[in-house]
């Protein structure tokens, strides 16, 4: 299965901000952005060239792709579905990305990062409404109950991720029973509840050209 093999810290440095791709490390002073906030590569410290208009739009798309860990083909399919739905395409896009099972599992603290949560999903560690689902791109619907299997819940990694997520607090659009390793996807998140640094408007402009 295709996946992005670029080093995660390098991806954050490319965007110039934390994308929280490496779990707990991102919350410590060991984070690469804390130590080297400039772009990666031989000329990273000297990179001050202005991006072209296309470059700005492309960078906005790449940032969203990196945050949610989706490949170009997946992203285009998600955008097409967002455009097909009623409402604002940009908000629909982010909502669909947040409704992916790997993203919901991450928000519920079943993994320290989206990539770790994706691994839990693929390894048959997640139940949706009592049924095993191992497809990371599965779209969770409002009202769906997502939980760890008994085996996954017993793992030290999942326990640590749940405890860390609980200490930071859960988003408003989900509710989580940490003791049971179970959560409910209450509603699609509102745009105001999602990162302001994501510029989905530029993605719409990019794909409309």
From Swiss-Prot:
Described purpose of this protein according to its UniProt entry: One of the primary rRNA binding proteins, it binds directly to 16S rRNA where it nucleates assembly of the body of the 30S subunit. With S5 and S12 plays an important role in translational accuracy.
NCBIfam families, A to Z: PRK05327.1 (NF003717), rpsD_bact (TIGR01017)
CC terms in the record's Gene Ontology section: small ribosomal subunit
Domain of life: Bacteria
Similarity comment: Belongs to the universal ribosomal protein uS4 family.
GO BP field: ribosomal small subunit biogenesis; translation
SUPFAM superfamilies in alphabetical order: Alpha-L RNA-binding motif (SSF55174)
Protein name as annotated: Small ribosomal subunit protein uS4
Keywords annotated in UniProt: Ribonucleoprotein, Ribosomal protein, RNA-binding, rRNA-binding
Domain called S4 RNA-binding: residue spans: 99-160
Presence of keyword Ligase: no
Gene that this polypeptide is encoded by: rpsD
Gene Ontology terms, MF aspect: rRNA binding; structural constituent of ribosome
Signal peptide: none
InterPro entries xref list: Ribosomal_uS4 (IPR022801), Ribosomal_uS4_bac-type (IPR005709), Ribosomal_uS4_N (IPR001912), S4_RNA-bd (IPR002942), S4_RNA-bd_sf (IPR036986)
Statement: the UniProt record of this protein carries the keyword Metal-binding: no
Record note on quaternary structure: Part of the 30S ribosomal subunit. Contacts protein S5. The interaction surface between S4 and S5 is involved in control of translational fidelity.
